[in-house]
Amino acid sequence: MRLYDTLSGGVRDFAPLRPGHVSIYLCGATVQGLPHIGHVRSGVAFDVLRRWLTAKGFDVAFIRNVTDIDDKILIKAADAGRPWWEWAATYERAFTAAYDALGVLPPSAEPRATGHITQMVELIDRLIERGHAYCADQEGNGDVYFSVSTLPEYGKLSGHRIDDVHQGEGVATGKRDQRDFTLWKGAKPGEPSWPTPWGRGRPGWHTECVAMCEAYLGAEFDIHAGGMDLVFPHHENEIAQAEAAGDGFARFWLHNGWVTMGGEKMSKSLGNVLAIPAVLQRVRAAELRYYLGSAHYRSMLEFSENALQDAARAYSGVEDFLHRVRVRVGAVVPGEWTPKFGAALDDDLAVPAALAEVHAARAEGNRALDAGDHDAALTYAMSIRAMMGILGADPLDERWESRDKTSAALAAVDVLVHAEVRRREDARARRDWAEADAIRDRLKEAGIEVTDTGDGPQWSLLDGTDK
């Protein structure tokens, strides 16, 4: 199997550190708000990697973290008048529901940043002792920074020259060099904080992931994955800390492309996001999964309604063939994938080529079925089930088999919407009618209507499905 490694800048042979075992760390969500389809693309892309490695016989340890302490979480929770931990927990559940709705396998472990403060403090202590980190010059303010100039190879992942680096953290009090980045943030009034040898505070984002990677996978592991927007500064700064601490860290760095609209990354700040509930009005969850996973994971996925509907039709074509075989021939169990399918996934997860094999088998299977060759049709159907299962989209899997719009996908949507409905109720309780109306309007833009009834607020999809 060959994978594109961002660090080396090319496709190279993959072999795990331990024969038969693969260790993967995927940067998960910063749980500051509801997920959109751009958020979950990495979950789908690397779920395919995990499924393929498992199908090949590897024992896969797959870690996906939750960033539950962050500047944006604190700001948004404060603006809403809610505890930061409640805010984070609410949207962590929303992300979990979104992953589940799209058939993403649960991770082997899903550590929260706040559960690993001890490991973060120990890591920072090591970096200070080795001369790669320092406490802020202002006595007792609690800030700790990584000294970029102490690591000559800094920038090797992203290609940034060390002299051109700017961390985007503004002019930080006590920072000796503007290229340096934050490891620990000194406590501020009203913010959560933890005790450390250098004062109370909370961790920096980059330190969180290094500590969690090593806590679960060790000082050296196989694959670190995430969106391409994380290459710099996040992943660059992870490498810097790990190597400065004397650890081997990740051997492969994999990065998925963005979901774009009009050539721009899908982002709340740009106002071009597509909420998952809104998309699930147009297509079923399995069809959305198929769409998000159909492009090569490293390519940009430009969203369009036509492309989404094309993907839905392609998925339905596979589904219809399998149903025809089951009705006319009998039970269809997963069989063997084709050699070309396996070769495609072994070539840096070339899902488009793998899907071409699926649709070639469907075409041949339909011809065999129409010709009355039931044995051949069944063989093709069994192969398709195996291939689509590896892609996480087997239409005959019990997860996807219901064609009813009020299936498990809608239950997941309910969890996503509940967080916003609760915020609206809180605003109404404060008699903040403007905020309550704004939340209702945002939900309506996502295709969800909220109606106040004697039994409390009820929401419905605009096609009339009530909850």
Swiss-Prot record:
This enzyme's EC code(s): 6.1.1.16
Domain of life: Bacteria
Keywords: Aminoacyl-tRNA synthetase, ATP-binding, Cytoplasm, Ligase, Metal-binding, Nucleotide-binding, Protein biosynthesis, Zinc
A Pfam family hit: DALR_2
Binding residue positions for ATP: 268
Keyword Amino-acid biosynthesis belongs to the record: no
Necessary cofactors: Zn(2+)
Subcellular location: Cytoplasm
Motif ('KMSKS' region): 265-269
Binding site for Zn(2+): 27, 209, 234, 238
CC annotations in GO: cytosol
Classification via SMART domains: DALR_2
GO molecular function, one term: cysteine-tRNA ligase activity
EC primary class: ligase
Catalytic activity: tRNA(Cys) + L-cysteine + ATP = L-cysteinyl-tRNA(Cys) + AMP + diphosphate
Motif 'HIGH' region per record, residues: 29-39
BP GO annotations: cysteinyl-tRNA aminoacylation
InterPro entries: Cys-tRNA-ligase, Cys-tRNA-synt_Ia_DALR, Cys-tRNA/MSH_ligase, CysS_C, Rossmann-like_a/b/a_fold, tRNA-synt_1_cat_dom, tRNAsynth_Ia_anticodon-bd
Record text on cofactor binding: Binds 1 zinc ion per subunit.
Subunit and partners: Monomer.
Family as reported in the entry's similarity comment: Belongs to the class-I aminoacyl-tRNA synthetase family.
Protein name: Cysteine--tRNA ligase
Gene this protein is translated from: cysS
